[in-house]
């Protein structure tokens, strides 16, 4: 990976998160313990995490022409990300609202806004950066067209791709067949089971995932499929049938927002830098766990030093 960057098909949202004792019932208003407003988005989070792991990062992040777009430039500067990632379009900048309860569980709503204006043409304009990258990552806060275009460019050039299909929607065949690494959580795995005509009940258990869902997905293009299971850890299945289970790490969780983004970016970057799959999974699980120990996401995403310290490396 020396001299090569991670290319992130990003998303940018102004993220508002509130800490509550419990989730409100329909029609109920609750007092929040804290409210945080910060730059966020799955794509931005993954880019920040990759940078904190020491990777050079390039990519695309779309913002609108409203006041919220002003959050983006200082966020990139603070994270050590290049301003060339920004694409300015007409319309509203993406926004998101998240609630975190006393146990650290979350629920999130996203208005993608300008992120959906990111296009295949934007991707084609960055083709050299994509074909020369060490890894290209995508997520579903943007549309299908830029992901399909970027992944096709990457795979033709022999560059691995990583897809985290969240917020979940059906994965187009053209995207899935160009995906090297597919990372899903338990909710997304259930939805994929239904889409593939499998019985979703119990499909997220390690044994059934490895025996049923993962092989069905691997037949369609990916070389590695990973199921994240929150505090329970993760399970990875390779195209040659290798199954690796990674236990979760016990931490004092205060806010699980961003943990999946930390996991995905860490797994991809560590694999791209030549680490073994077991080591990359372990580092990814640690990154996700450490992210949950602080409120918010931007400052909670851990450094490589913190990950290696917890891993004893």
Regions found by a protein language model. Name each.
Residues 80, 116-121, 161-168:
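Short gly/ser/thr-rich secondary-structure transition/capping motifs
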Residues 135-211, 232-234:
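Conserved beta-alpha-beta core of the PfkB/ribokinase-like small-molecule kinase fold
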Residues 1-62, 67-73, 77-78, 252-253:
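Glycine-rich phosphate/adenosyl-contacting loop at the front of the ribokinase-like
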Residues 88, 98-140:
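Conserved phosphate-binding/catalytic loop of the ribokinase/pfkB sugar-kinase fold
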Residues 2-6, 169-170, 199-313:
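Conserved phosphate-binding/catalytic region of the ribokinase-like
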Residues 75-90:
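A glycine-rich helix N-cap at a beta->alpha junction
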Residues 127-131, 176-177, 219:
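A short, aliphatic-rich alpha-helical micro-motif
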